[in-house]
Amino acid sequence: MKVSLAGQTVDVKKILNEIPKRTVTAALLEGGEIVAVEEADDEHAERKLVRRHDVEGKVVFVTARPCLYCARELAEAGVAGVVYLGRGRGLGPYYLARSGVEVVEVHPDEPLGYDPVDRLDVLLTFGGNPYLTEEDVAARVYCLLTGRGFDADIAPAPENLSGRVEIMVTRGDPDEAVELLKEELPVFRIRRFLISGEFDRDELRERILEDIEPRILDPFAVRARIARAGAFSSSREAEVFIGDVLTSVGREVNLNDPRTVVTVDVLGPRVSVGVEKR
């Protein structure tokens, strides 16, 4: 993907392959080439770039949507253009545009789709952060994975499931991708889907007994969170199915005990099962 602004042509994929992916990164561009890079730590990457480098008349590439405060500093420093990963303007990009700075938003999935990817290898969940949208996180994940040699289809979860990003690794080892995401994005909850592909109740039963049952502590509860109609007709049906499987191996299911929760996510014909201790 290439975009043009402020007299420069920016090759988005090329830039992503050349910058660090540990956290939010801001790159200063001249003639479409990187001349300086700063990473976020105790302060935002864009502010570090402005403070340490001459950005006047140049283009800045950011791997997240700039906040309002960074946007003000970028505009005051005289940047000519800003390219950022994400979807939706927000206050930062809106301020830049009002200040006469060319702004281009890019996303790995243009146009962005809200349907889950065909096969869900990884589910990333986050919450409680008012400054991050599902699209922002999807863009960061794309930046990180492609920069390390993976190819992946990434989509924010449907609108009724906020704080979730779904990932299908199309090139590279999904297990390695998961470990990379856990290492580089420790603030997010990242897990492999135990079930991928077509729904199969016999296979689901085997996975429950193999992966879920040994990790459960008595007494425990069983819960089901239904994301989309399909495999089960209701959350209660999913609860009963999981409960029956566990009861068949000697686990008494107490649906009212909140201390340990077995979560069932039903996405179309795909089902994943995970354990959450509380």
Swiss-Prot record:
Entries under CDD domains matching the protein: THUMP
PROSITE patterns assigned to the protein according to its UniProt record, in alphabetical order: CYT_DCMP_DEAMINASES_2, THUMP
Domain CMP/dCMP-type deaminase residue range list: 1-102
Gene3D superfamilies: 3.30.70.1940, Cytidine Deaminase, domain 2 (3.40.140.10), THUMP superfamily (3.30.2300.10)
Alphabetical UniProt keywords: Hydrolase, Metal-binding, RNA-binding, tRNA processing, tRNA-binding, Zinc
SUPFAM superfamilies according to UniProt: Cytidine deaminase-like, THUMP domain-like
GO molecular function, one term: hydrolase activity, acting on carbon-nitrogen (but not peptide) bonds, in cyclic amidines
Residue span, THUMP domain: 175-277
Active site: E46
Entry's cofactor comment: Binds 1 zinc ion.
GO biological process: cytidine to uridine editing; tRNA modification
EC number annotated for this UniProt entry: 3.5.4.35
Binding site for Zn(2+): H44, C67, C70
Keyword Hydrolase: yes
Reactions this protein catalyses: cytidine(8) in tRNA + H2O + H(+) = uridine(8) in tRNA + NH4(+)
Necessary cofactors: Zn(2+)
InterPro entries noted in UniProt: CMP_dCMP_dom (IPR002125), Cytidine_deaminase-like (IPR016193), THUMP_dom (IPR004114)
Function: Catalyzes the deamimation of cytosine to uracil at position 8 of tRNA in 30 different tRNAs. This editing guarantees the proper folding and functionality of the tRNAs.
Family listed: Belongs to the cytidine and deoxycytidylate deaminase family.
Subunit description: Homodimer.
Name of the molecule in the record: tRNA(cytosine(8)) deaminase
